[in-house]
Every structure is written in structure tokens, then in C-alpha cells.
């Protein structure tokens, strides 16, 4: 999910408020003059996006497939200790809101907090309405990440995200000069390698394929030179 967040970062202009850091990311002219979404549109979009993302996570979880980022860490804890994914995902994101507030501002942080809370809630509610007896891992990795990609695109278009280690990577880049993309990749690789303690190599291959597919979807559909919304 690291490349996806990098594309979101490059698309909008955010200025760091960290003392000693003067960092502004340029905004494309098309995005600068785009009509802003209304509050009602943002609320509707966040609900739709989080329903999609949470259902994508349910498919991955049901098939035992992994993903990267904070969601991957939450799945790792879920598989290891049988804790509810929603509660773990919500708790893992809590430390990152302070960095988000400093890095992206209060509106982005508020939307991200709401998105994380909704994904945490919906991911545990889908099981009330849907029971999956059998799910092939390859199919789950492809379909789950397709759905995740659509959900992320909606969140990004409405200037929100699912926070987590993406924000940490961007903060460390601003503060210490580390490359956020490489940091994110390192975290994702670490999560996937840690998952080898309870998943097989074929499942790991499906997980890697799904992660590549997710980033490809966002890279192709969240571009400032093509879309202004």
C-alpha cells in the first residue's frame, strides 16, 4: 500500500508544521481548481469506501491471505492471537493520528479517523450477514485486492486514507530524510515474512500478487494528469 499513499501525497499540497522543516508538496493545476466535495458527499463516500475496504479484508482474512501496511499487521495479530481484526486495526492506528495531524492537518486526520473506525466496525459486521464456507486463496487475493483498490481510490479522491504506517513513513521522510517508499516497502516485506510462521509459500505468493495488484490499480487510476477530482 506504500506506492498508493505516495500517489496520494504527490497529488495534493501539504505543508509540514514540524519545527525546522519547510516542506511543501506541489499540487497539479487541474487539482487546484477542481470543485471541492461537499460534506454530504464526503460522508457518503467514506461509508461506501469503508464498506468496500472492510469486505475486501474479510475475503483476505477468510482465505488466510496477507496484505501489507497496518492492515497486514492487524491480520498478523488476528491470525496469531485470534483477536478481533476490527479492534486490533483500530488500536494500531491510534498512535499515528498525532503524526497525521502535524503532517496533513485536522480535516484529513478527522476523515482518516472516521475511515479507520468504520473499517474496524464493518469488518466484524460482515460475518453477521455473510458466511463463506470455502474460498480459494488466489481468487480471494485477486478479488479482495480489487475491492480494496476501489475503496482506496474513493478515500483518496475525498482526501482521506486508512492512516497507519503510511503516515509514519512520510513523517520519517520529512524528519530524517528517509525515503518513504522504501520504508513502506520494508515494513510490508517484514509483515509478509513474519506471516511465514503460519501461512504456506503458495499463500505467500498469492499475498504478494494481491499487493502488487492493489498498487497497480491505484497507480493507474489515481493520477493528477488524468483526473482532477
Segments the model singles out, each with a brief description of its role:
Residues 5-229:
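Core subunits and conserved enzymes of cellular information-processing
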Amino acid at each position: 500500500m506504500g506506492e498508493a499513499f505516495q500517489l496520494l501525497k504527490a497529488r495534493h499540497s501539504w505543508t509540514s508544521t514540524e519545527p525546522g522543516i519547510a516542506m511543501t508538496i506541489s499540487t497539479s493545476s487541474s487539482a487546484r481548481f477542481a470543485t471541492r466535495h461537499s460534506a454530504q458527499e464526503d460522508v457518503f463516500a467514506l461509508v461506501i469506501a469503508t464498506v468496500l475496504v472492510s469486505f475486501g479484508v474479510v475475503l483476505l482474512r477468510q482465505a488466510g491471505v496477507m496484505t501489507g501496511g497496518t492492515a497486514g499487521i492487524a491480520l498478523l495479530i488476528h491470525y496469531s492471537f485470534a483477536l478481533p481484526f476490527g479492534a486490533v486495526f483500530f488500536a494500531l492506528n491510534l498512535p499515528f493520528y498525532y503524526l497525521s495531524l502535524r503532517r496533513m492537518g485536522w480535516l484529513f486526520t478527522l476523515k482518516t479517523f472516521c475511515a479507520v473506525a468504520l473499517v474496524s466496525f464493518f469488518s466484524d459486521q460482515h460475518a453477521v450477514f455473510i458466511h463463506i464456507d470455502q474460498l480459494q486463496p488466489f481468487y480471494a487475493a485477486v478479488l479482495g485486492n480489487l475491492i480494496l483498490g476501489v475503496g482506496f481510490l474513493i478515500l483518496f479522491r475525498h482526501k482521506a486514507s486508512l492512516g497507519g504506517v503510511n503516515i509514519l513513513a512520510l513523517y520519517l521522510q520529512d524528519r530524517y530524510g528517509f525515503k518513504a517508499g522504501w520504508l513502506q516497502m520494508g515494513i510490508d516485506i517484514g509483515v509478509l515474512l513474519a506471516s511465514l510462521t503460519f501461512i504456506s509459500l503458495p499463500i505467500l505468493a498469492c499475498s504478494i500478487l494481491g499487493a502488487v495488484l492493489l498498487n497497480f490499480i491505484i497507480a493507474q487510476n489515481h493520477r493528477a494528469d488524468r483526473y482532477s477530482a
